[in-house]
Amino acid sequence: GIVSPPLLLTAIPFDMGDIIISLGIIGPLAAIVAILFMRLVLFTGTIPAKINIKNWQAPIIAGFACGICGMIFSEVLGLGTDVLMSVITTQLLFGYLFALLLGKLILTSICIGFGFFGGLFSPALFLGGVLGAIIFQLPVTAANPDLLSVLAVSGMAAVSSSVIGAPLTAIILVLELTGSYEYAIA
C-alpha cells in the first residue's frame, strides 16, 4: 500500500520575508531548549545515585511520576504525535503551549534519567513543534495564521537538529515527516 507521511501538511504559499524575524527568534530559543533538555536529562540521571535509590527502584519512581502526570496532563505522555499534529494545525493558547513544553521537558528527563528506555529524538520534535507554536504567538508573526505550521515545523527541525547534532539529517527528516519540500527549506 501507499504510505503517507505522519504529519501530512498541505503546502502553503509563504514569503520567506514574512517569517525571517520569527526564524531568527526560533534559532537561539531552540538552542536554549535543546541545551536545557540535554542538561536536564543528564542531571536527572545523577539523582538516583545521589539519594541512594537502587537501580530497580528508579524506573518504578519514574513510572509513578508518569502515572500521576498522566492523570493530570496526559498530553505529555508517549510520542505525542496527535498532540503535535494539533499544535501544528490549531492555534492553541500560550499558557497551554508553555505547559506542554515544560511538562514534556521535565517528564522525559525524569523517565530517561531514572532508567526508562526511550530516545530523545521524538521528544525533541515535540518540544520544537511546541516552541514554534509559542513563537507564532508573538505579535511579529500572528498576522498570518498560515505561518503557524511553518514555524512549528521549523521549531521541530531546530530543536531536534540540536539534540541529535545533525542539522542536515533533521532537514531530511522534516521532508520525510511532512512530505513537503516547502517546509523542509523553511
Describe the predicted segments one by one.
Residues G1-A186:
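Alpha-helical transmembrane segments and immediately membrane-proximal extracytoplasmic
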